Structure formats: structure tokens, C-alpha cells
């Protein structure tokens, strides 16, 4: 069991399995997640340069992004020293550099220790989106459990499942500027949905 719980993302099998389940769920159920935040007011807000766009994607951050890239290429992720913020004051401790989504343009972002679903309008109850999000992630975890329960070599099969899932659903991962026109074109090439209004 000690191999399952480690500090680095790529060493933490349980974390990577849950991460893969969330990525798969967001990719496969983009439409349900978008519907969960639909309203006339929110349709105008999304993509209005003060909120995420209507195209759903997952922001992973630099550290996790490099881990995903390594897994996708079939190589072992290497530990990378955390960058520290230099304050120029000797009496203050070093602070680790933030690798999260600083410009907050991503609708679904991993921010170091949690996911944030940022498409909800201020008047929304979180109940509906949470119900959908929990249900779709549970669906993916059930599929993973079915695949792993009879595993002969659990850790190898878990790693293979994570790698396969990331390769099949990496189109939903985007770490750039979600407001850019280039992203809208790239998202269309990737086959991602751009449901700008509730009618769609």
C-alpha cells in the first residue's frame, strides 16, 4: 500500500488514477457540464472576458502537465526541483513558485491540490453542477474499478490504465490562454464542444 501514496504526482498512483478519471469524465461529458451552468445570464457571461469561455477544457499546471506529457510519451516522469520565489530578504522563508492558472481563463483547473469548476454564475446553486460532476466521475471510477479488480499485477495494470486514459483524453487538456482566438480554432480541431448558448 505504501507504493500507492507518494508526494510527487507521478509517484502517487491513487492521485493519478483519480486525476485520469476526472479528465476522462470532463472530456466525455462536456455537454452535461455545460448544461449544468446554463442560463440566459451565464450564457452572456461565459467567454465575456471576465469568465471562462464556453469551451470546456482542463488546466493542469506546469508540474502536472510535464508528468502527463511524460506518461503520454511512455517515459518515466522525472522529479523536478520546485522553483522558489526570491524576495531578496534574508529574514523571510523561501516560498514555492505558484504553478497554477494565474490568469484564471480555464473553465476547469487543477490548482495544486484541488480542481476548480469555474463556469458557475454567481446566482447558481452548486448543487446541480456538483451532482453532475460527482456522477460522471463516479461512472469513470466504476469503469476503472471493474478493470482493476481482477488485476494480476495491480500497479502495472493501474499505470497502464492511467497512461491509456491520458492518451485517449488528452485533447481536453489545455494550459494556454482560453480567451485567444487560436484556442477556439484549436478546440474545434480537437473536436471539443463550443456550446455558446443554452439552446445548443
Model-based region annotation:
Residues 1-5:
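Short, small-residue-biased leader/transition segments that mark boundaries at the very start
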Residues 6-15, 126:
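Conserved phosphate-binding loops in nucleotide/dinucleotide-binding enzymes
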Residues 17-20:
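Conserved active-site neighborhood of enzyme catalytic/cofactor-binding cores
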Residues 25-200:
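Acidic, glycine-enriched catalytic cores built around paired aspartates
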Amino acid at each position: 500500500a505504501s507504493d500507492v501514496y507518494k508526494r510527487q504526482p507521478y509517484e502517487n498512483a491513487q492521485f493519478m488514477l483519480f486525476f485520469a478519471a476526472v479528465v476522462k469524465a470532463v472530456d466525455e461529458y462536456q455537454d452535461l457540464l455545460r448544461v449544468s451552468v446554463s442560463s440566459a445570464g451565464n450564457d452572456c457571461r461565459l467567454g465575456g472576458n471576465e469568465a471562462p469561455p464556453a469551451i470546456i477544457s482542463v488546466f493542469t499546471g506546469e508540474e502536472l502537465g510535464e508528468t502527463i506529457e511524460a506518461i503520454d510519451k511512455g517515459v518515466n516522469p522525472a522529479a523536478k526541483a520546485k522553483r522558489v520565489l526570491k524576495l531578496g530578504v534574508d529574514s523571510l522563508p523561501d516560498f514555492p513558485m505558484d504553478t497554477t492558472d494565474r490568469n484564471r481563463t480555464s473553465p476547469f483547473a487543477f490548482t495544486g491540490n484541488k480542481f476548480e469548476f469555474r463556469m458557475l454564475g454567481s446566482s447558481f446553486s452548486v448543487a446541480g453542477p456538483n451532482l453532475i460532476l460527482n456522477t460522471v466521475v463516479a461512472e469513470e471510477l466504476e469503469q476503472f474499478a471493474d478493470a482493476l479488480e481482477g488485476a494480476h499485477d495491480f500497479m502495472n495494470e493501474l499505470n497502464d490504465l492511467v497512461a491509456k486514459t491520458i492518451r485517449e483524453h488528452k485533447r481536453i487538456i489545455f494550459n494556454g490562454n482560453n480567451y485567444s482566438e487560436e484556442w477556439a480554432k484549436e478546440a474545434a480541431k480537437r473536436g471539443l464542444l463550443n456550446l455558446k448558448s443554452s439552446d445548443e
